Amino acid sequence: MRLIRLATLVATAAVGAAFCGPALVRAQPRCRAVPKEHPRLLGSRERLQKLARQRAKAYQRVVSVARKRKADDHSKLVSMALVCAIEEDRALGRQAIAKVLKAIAGPIPRGHVPFAHTLGRCAIVYDLCHEHWTAAERKQFHTFMNRTVDANVRSETHVFHNGWYGYKTWGIGTACYATYYENPRAAAILDAVENEFRTRAAPALELAGAGGGWGEGYYIHYWLYEWLFFCEIARLCDGTDYYAMAPKFFRSRAVAGMFEMYPGISTYGSRRPIPMGDGGGRVFGGDRDKALAARRILASLYRDDPAHQVVHAFNETTPRFSVGVYAYKDFLWRDTTVKRGDLASFKRSHFSPGPGYVYARSAWDESATHFFFTCGDRFTAHQHLDVGHFLIYRHGELVGDGGHYDGFGTPHDVNYHLRTIAHNTIRVYAPSETWPNIRAGRATGNDGGQHHNWPHHNGAVTDAATWTKGRRLYDIADMLAFEDHGDWLYVAGDCSRAYSPKKLDYFTRQIVYLRPGTFVIFDRVAARRADLKKTWTLQAMKRPQGKGAMWTITNGKGRLFIQTLLPAGVGVKLFSGDELYRYGGRNYPPRRNTGPAPECRMEVSPARLAKVDYFLHVLTATDASAGAPDEARVTTGDAEVHIAVGKAKITFGKAAVGGSITLNGKRQRLAARAGTSR
């Protein structure tokens, strides 16, 4: 094997590789045990016919979509192809082929468009309806496939970004398996796909996806299902195991994905994923079904693992996809032969060190309290400037992500939505600080937040090797501690490097979660100068009610009590209505509404400026009918801060991260560094 640049392969008819960047490529395509007969992408005809008998109800819904119902192109073509293969229905196959021929007769897609979906669904029709294609039609598809590959050598090259997987590669790989032996270039292109994944994408998944979370955030729900669809095709066709190339990600992804769902079953029997960066899923969409399908594939794959048996039990609480024309996903991926684990007794928190995510719940019932905390590094475009940010949910969001994703690089996006001001973390205002253009949008606002000092305007890095080379730029945070003791959970993060060193010495955040609903949040913040104002920011779903140090947020059936214990004598400001998106004398309203978002920004600042400040808050999530909790009590000394809340007594150190907790007569240390993000 020799190291070459894949971009140069387009010029060679023998390979015609689809990618750009270094990868190992054999001079001759490797010998693969791909079946020569069709269908093969989803197994043999006999396998599909057996599935139709085993999953008869789901299959009949597929038949209805294939023959009667209106549907999007993807669902329609996949359903038609499945029924054609299972029932050997030539007429239906020819209808599907006619749709494909129309799709591939147009201009060759290129650039940041999801051409993988076109390739993927057309390839599925090619394979499952293979005997009904004429030789000339097959050649026409080969030409379309090869020209699409060649046109997109330099498209979607960043492997921390959803586009590499969902817009590009899954479709190319699927088309290669469908046309193997018949398209002279398919074998070499498929080798390029595998080697690109092995040498660039897998290391990225291991780095930014260790523990099953993903640094890009919510966008994982937009691409993971399609990528797993391709991984299953590879496994079925020739035994290639893409999962084994990135085990730190794949073996934990289903569990992390389960924790990424808010409690409660909502629109059309779906579960809403938590907001992480761009996206956010505030209103119902097909991404919810994609998330379920991805968990189903992984639960079936790792069926002998007890944790995945619990995931299967969780999946079965929403046994049917919400979108009716997605019946083919139920048919293909709902595997009821997996043993159901005991969901109620499963762990109630999960740490994903790659992206620096901690997820926690009070229980596994639908009325549980849900908590999310992020303190991780920079990888790609759809991340926000949100290190130290957290979410709290009970019967609905209580504190969330501010702003609206009204477009990529809009004035609202780059001055509010992705900025620190729209998140539940700390801001330090230096009057002279400026931000470069972000996402090709003009950043005019000084929100006092985290920096955006990366070479690419998106803040993106191409792959793990480039990230490691530029680690001093992209390694901006550390998850210092994570421990769950049942009644309480403790996390600690160092957020310091996410800010300009010209204004901040350090910012550490420690959170003790006392189940079921109390959160003690202690922040140590040291500015470079005493005159730099510090602000503790909270994005409230509804305008808080109260005064002084005690406030209440009520959203539907949920309520959050907020107690500010430090600094003493704080100033509290609320920004809502026309003032919500205004700061620094400018207003940055969104161009469109993306669904229910925080309606008020709460800002807490010390009454007196100082170089070092300590912020201490107690947040208690309850039912809306619950009365106020007992007031927490705080005492401060030269070296420590002591707080009594309920039955717990907690101590935090002032000079460094760490402390102790005493609960039910048992004293335990709060670790200063029990786990790290790398």
Spell out what each predicted region is.
Residues 1-11:
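Bacterial N-terminal signal peptides that target proteins for export
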Residues 13-14, 25:
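Cleavable N-terminal signal peptides
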Residues 20, 25-29:
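Boundary at the C-terminal end of the N-terminal hydrophobic targeting segment
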Residues 28-63, 130, 489, 540, ...:
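Acidic/polar, glycine-enriched structural segments that form the non-catalytic walls/loops
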Residues 32, 38-41, 48, 52-55, ...:
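Aromatic-lined, polymer-binding surfaces characteristic
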Residues 179, 222-398, 605-615, 629-678:
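Carbohydrate-active enzyme catalytic cores, enriched for enzymes
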Residues 319-559, 563-571, 579, 609-624, ...:
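Catalytic and substrate-binding regions of extracellular carbohydrate-active enzymes
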Residues 592-607:
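Extracellular adhesion/glycan-binding regions together with long Ser/Thr-
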